[in-house]
Amino acid sequence: MANKREYPLAKTRNIGIMAHIDAGKTTATERILYYTGKIHKIGETHDGASQMDWMDEEKERGITITSAATTAVWKDNRINIIDTPGHVDFTVEVERALRVLDGAVTVLDAQAGVEPQTETVWRQADQFNVPRIVFANKMDKIGANFDYSVQTIKDRLNVTPLPIQMPIGAEDDFIGLVDLVKMVAYVYDEDKLGTNWDTVEIPDDMKEEAQKRHDEMVETLADIDDNLMEKYLEGEEISVDEIKAAIRKGTLEEQIFPVLAGSAYKDKGIQMMLDAVIDYLPSPIDVKPFVAHDADGNEIELTAGDDKPFAALAFKIATDPFVGRLTFLRVYTGSLQSGSYVLNATKDKRERIGRLLQMHSNQQQEIPEVFSGDIAAAIGLKNTTTGDSLTDPDHPLQLESMDFPEPVIQVSVEPKSKADQDKMDKGLQKLAEEDPTFKAETNPETGETLIAGMGELHLDIIVERLRREFHAEVTVGKPQVSYREAFTKTASAQGKFVRQSGGKGQYGDVWIEFTPLKEGEGFEFEDAIVGGVVPREFIPAVEQGLKEAMQNGVLAGYPLVDMHAKLYDGSYHEVDSSEAAFKVAASLALKNAAKKADPVILEPIMKVDIVVPQDNMGDVMGQVTARRGTIDGMEERGNAQLIHSFVPLSEMFGYATALRSATQGRGTFTMTFDHYSAVPKSVQEDIIKKNGGNN
């Protein structure tokens, strides 16, 4: 018999907690779990005891690396929380989480307001149309300023913040909050770990300001809600319920972003933030329909409901030391019992779900069934990877899959002993399954293993995990940039391979036109053969031969990218032609065309945002230019400056140290991959020389 769902869809929230690194996001999540009864002792990030940061590396570094999923209950509502990393090397984890969330809480440091990485995650959330509320955290910190934080939301994110609270006091005198919706004050009892507070009248010296802010809030809401506008203009009384309904409507439409205040570390404001999650963030039935395609390629809109065929997205793979491979699922429609079969529509393979688990950070509770709107983990899926669609075998649906950026930085890793080799290979395979932006490959010529990822921290953590989880001792080489190669001109060339030396000969002959494509367009192959001059059965071999040759490039051994190849002529031999001969012919055509196609080496260009004190501006801009960077604009940030720049990744190694010394440790920067661009001629010559050329 089917199980009943425990919490109705309308009382389910799937939320993410997102922030700049060090804004206090993990501590805020901890407090949520504490107040919703999920943990009995509070863990602080800075003493390595936090519940959500469950990998050893996270405990050591005090940053959140993988999005742990956990579930909590607040006032008869189920809240599934995904904790997301704030470090730029892990933006993919953030995108992966945003993809399956319905709403998010953005945590700010109330002293700094919106920081560069906040802007990055905010833009990612915009991309996925995720409604958000904002929690101005660390109100107890020296320099904390709620109004400044609200202003930075307006100025830096270009959206309409809606403060629905105001703090009572700040820094050491932060004792509570004024609720601008209900027009009451909450004053905390310092001794009770935030579990006790008194609801009192607004303090006399704050009444006038609170009324002014309440009126401003209602005015903002009236602009986006016609019912409220009418009442407001008529001067009629507007009830608390009407205000809350208008805030909810505006938040779901992303017209406004409610802002709350608090201090997670000092246990203040978390329960009110949880109330706001329930009151203002969407349930699975409030979000826009999700787009999928049926077996015939027709577009279908999916809305949440248990009575529909099962459809879910696998959004993360993790390896658990006790139960093995876990596949995290977001269920969009239908329900699924443990032990049943699903169709992996992406790979067209049937898979059996062994057990279903509800995750609490890294502890699991087994559950018999999952329902529409749930986030859970499954054991037993062997062929499923991140971004795959899992559906009812009788109703195959393809959900929109996830795009992941290519890694931009690589290092060589070498096992210290023969025993370490096997452990390393096994570990790298598992880690690559978990993380689509991490790749491991062996150079066929040198036998060297290269691992590639999104940044130095990303690769540091991979190496740490190899040592810790897979007990593989490895030596790590210097970081190298993942260069690419590309043609800049259209060129045609013949590739002819003839070998006669006793026994069966070899014969393959092709003419191919190569045309450069725009960045990111990949490789396209066009068969323009007329009259069978190259027989049909050899054409796939030509394409394969090109793909293999492109992997090794034409200048310095880097992959050749973004090219259209048109096979338009050639010849064959009745007896001597073979797939192998045509593969070689294709690679010769590529090599010959390269001489006329002006090939270039492309390097990853990073978007680097640097926050520096005014006095260090000149030095830091000089550093950017010296590193072949370009300045793309500046903004004032209080008494600091934010410099937007683009710098080649190859020039960014060791930059953290250089910036620290130029700014006495006060400068910070964030770096994300932006695009590939041709290297200057002199740099290209150096790279070719260093790699011993490829021709």
Swiss-Prot record:
Annotated GO biological processes are:
ribosome disassembly
Can you tell me which family this protein belongs to? Answer: Belongs to the TRAFAC class translation factor GTPase superfamily. Classic translation factor GTPase family. EF-G/EF-2 subfamily.
Kindly indicate whether the keyword Cytoplasm belongs to this entry.
yes
Q: Name one GO cellular component term.
A: cytoplasm
Which HAMAP family does the entry mention? EF_G_EF_2_B
Please give the Gene Ontology molecular function terms for this protein: GTP binding; GTPase activity; translation elongation factor activity
Which keywords, in A-to-Z order, does the entry hold? Cytoplasm, Elongation factor, GTP-binding, Nucleotide-binding, Protein biosynthesis
Instruction: Quote the SUPFAM superfamilies the UniProt record gives.
Output: EF-G C-terminal domain-like, P-loop containing nucleoside triphosphate hydrolases, Ribosomal protein S5 domain 2-like, Translation proteins
Q: What does this protein do?
A: Catalyzes the GTP-dependent ribosomal translocation step during translation elongation. During this step, the ribosome changes from the pre-translocational (PRE) to the post-translocational (POST) state as the newly formed A-site-bound peptidyl-tRNA and P-site-bound deacylated tRNA move to the P and E sites, respectively. Catalyzes the coordinated movement of the two tRNA molecules, the mRNA and conformational changes in the ribosome.
The answer to whether the entry has keyword ATP-binding is no
Kindly provide the name given to this protein in its UniProt entry: Elongation factor G
Protein localization: Cytoplasm
What Pfam families does the record tag this protein with? Answer: EF-G_D2 (PF22042), EFG_C (PF00679), EFG_III (PF14492), EFG_IV (PF03764), GTP_EFTU (PF00009)
Q: Which domain of life is it from?
A: Bacteria
Kindly give the NCBIfam families that the UniProt entry links to this protein: EF-G, PRK12740.1-3, PRK12740.1-5, PRK13351.1-1, small_GTP
Query: Which parts of the sequence bind GTP?
Result: 19-26, 83-87, 137-140
In what residue span(s) does the tr-type G domain sit?
10-285
Principal place where this protein is found?
A: cytoplasm
